[in-house]
């Protein structure tokens, strides 16, 4: 395999044969592999190994979300500050590995697409594994395109046709990437089963609805350059809704609980689930603990990153229960390891903490949390796409096409106990997305960029509450500037810098202005 900055790892990823236990277990080679159904399944499991990588959906990609006006860094260092301030070089340890890791996923998918069709295994397994490979290639390419590509240059397209080339070039524009992503995800949708057909040990694998969902997400981004793609967003959102898997919001007419319960361990695979980072007590995303109080009041090793801003807190509509489900403020009552207490923080820069992923912390520590506080995973899956996003993407597409998106947006609002909108506007849609997806990988920053709102939003300071006694839940506060206004140049900062080592090794051009 050629050595190149795209990080296309030659060796098969080594992992357990169980989808839910992807602990590395040595290496394999072509000489002793690609023989049996177990080999094919083993290879497909390697597509998900990045779920256990802090540099991906632990903290890594959240540094991009953290650039938004919803979040303030917490425990700031020079590298994280550079990312948030749009002065990064791409060398920063916070963000210098995601680019190559997404290409590693693509290479693993390419290996499957090349090798599995000729294996003497059942058609069912063959279709499943190849379908997962097409999905994960499209999924990885989606994130690469969203973060690194634009109309001036796409990101290198690597498929089974050119995977062994020594050099790659950047396509003329990102629309070339979108075409490849769409092709891959359509193949995946054709080959993959509905998620409801999986047994418990395989829940979390790529599925038909996830392929349609990422097709919708791809076309939302594509519509920035081609307005006709809004109709495709509606089409693919409807394909999720009508697939037969029963995707719907968790809505029991109990607004105080329903939204919060989306992020309960027992609802990892609820009717709202489409695709998530699979996690358990020894494997998966550490994001919940990353957001928890630094050192966790001496009870558990929280890391104290990513604090909600006062701007996010104030953005919620009056009476919206999603604010309480999303944010802890001083004096709020919450349960920690079986004991009720009132929230305070010696760590928070803003006086707030994300509450969205705190359910695993309600119980005795050994029930849902990794005993290893140095890699504090939990049993809570972290959503990448959920059904509320399908509804709000469709609503946005309809509004952008001059049509009415009230039905979809009001389903989301009604679940929160809020009144119906009539003739919902794009401004109202934007607020709804902010309230629904705060602190998630759905990514407020990417929304602001594609809407053209980032420059104005980031020209304002991020503020918070400075409490006079940080250990007193009832302490009074003053409003302070936590992060100064930032200079966001929409002709440069709409994408991120490709890590310079990858640029140097591959010979591709860096994104303009970085």
PLM region spans:
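A glycine-rich, coil/turn loop motif that links secondary-structure elements
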Residues: 125-131, 198-211, 422
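Short coil/linker segments at helix-helix boundaries
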Residues: 148-175, 227-231
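Flexible, polar/acidic helix-loop-strand segments at domain edges
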Residues: 317-386
């Amino acid at each position: 395999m050629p050595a190149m900055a795209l990080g296309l790892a030659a060796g098969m990823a080594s992992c357990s044969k169980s989808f839910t236990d992807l602990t590395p277990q040595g290496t394999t080679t072509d000489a002793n592999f690609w023989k049996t159904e177990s080999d094919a399944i083993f290879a497909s499991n390697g597509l998900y190994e990045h779920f256990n990588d802090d540099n991906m959906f632990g903290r890594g990609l959240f540094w991009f979300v953290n650039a938004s006006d919803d979040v303030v860094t917490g425990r700031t260092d020079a590298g994280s500050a550079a990312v948030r301030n749009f002065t990064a070089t791409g060398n920063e340890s916070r963000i210098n590995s995601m680019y190559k890791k997404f290409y590693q996923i693509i290479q693993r998918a390419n290996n499957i697409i090349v090798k599995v069709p000729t294996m003497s295994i059942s058609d069912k397994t063959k279709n499943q594994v190849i379908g997962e490979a097409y999905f994960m290639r499209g999924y990885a390419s989606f994130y690469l395109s969203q973060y690194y590509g634009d109309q001036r240059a796409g990101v290198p397209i690597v498929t089974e046709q050119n995977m062994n080339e020594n050099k790659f070039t950047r396509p003329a524009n990102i629309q070339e990437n979108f075409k490849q992503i769409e092709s891959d995800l359509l193949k995946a949708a054709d080959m993959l089963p509905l998620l409801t057909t999986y047994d418990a040990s395989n829940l979390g694998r790529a599925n038909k609805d996830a392929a349609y969902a990422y097709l919708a997400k791809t076309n939302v981004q594509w519509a920035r350059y081609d307005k006709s793609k809004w109709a495709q967003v509606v089409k693919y959102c409807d394909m999720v809704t009508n697939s037969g898997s029963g995707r719907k919001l968790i809505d029991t007419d109990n607004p105080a609980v329903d939204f919060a319960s989306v992020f309960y361990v027992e609802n990892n695979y609820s009717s709202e689930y489409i695709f998530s980072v699979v996690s358990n007590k020894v494997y998966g995303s550490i994001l919940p603990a990353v957001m928890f109080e630094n050192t966790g009041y001496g009870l558990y090793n929280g890391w104290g990153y990513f604090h909600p801003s006062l701007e996010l807190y104030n953005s919620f509509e009056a009476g919206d229960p999603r604010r309480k489900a999303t944010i802890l403020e001083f004096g709020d009552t919450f349960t920690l390891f079986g004991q009720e207490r009132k929230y305070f923080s010696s760590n928070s820069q803003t006086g707030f903490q994300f509450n969205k992923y705190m359910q695993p912390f309600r119980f005795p520590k050994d029930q849902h949390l990794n005993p290893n506080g140095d890699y504090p995973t939990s049993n809570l899956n972290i959503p990448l796409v959920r059904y509320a996003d399908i509804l709000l993407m469709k609503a946005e597409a309809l509004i952008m096409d001059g049509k009415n998106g009230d039905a979809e947006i009001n389903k989301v609002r009604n679940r929160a106990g809020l009144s119906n909108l009539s003739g919902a506007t794009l401004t109202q849609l934007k607020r709804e997305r902010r309230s629904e997806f705060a602190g998630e990988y759905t990514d407020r920053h990417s929304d602001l960029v594609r809407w053209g709102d980032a420059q104005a939003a980031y020209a304002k300071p991020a503020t918070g509450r400075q409490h006079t006694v940080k250990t007193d839940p009832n302490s009074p506060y003053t409003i302070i500037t936590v992060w100064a206004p930032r200079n966001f140049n929409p002709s440069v900062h709409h994408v991120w810098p490709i890590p310079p080592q990858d640029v140097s090794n591959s010979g591709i051009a860096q994104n303009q202005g970085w």
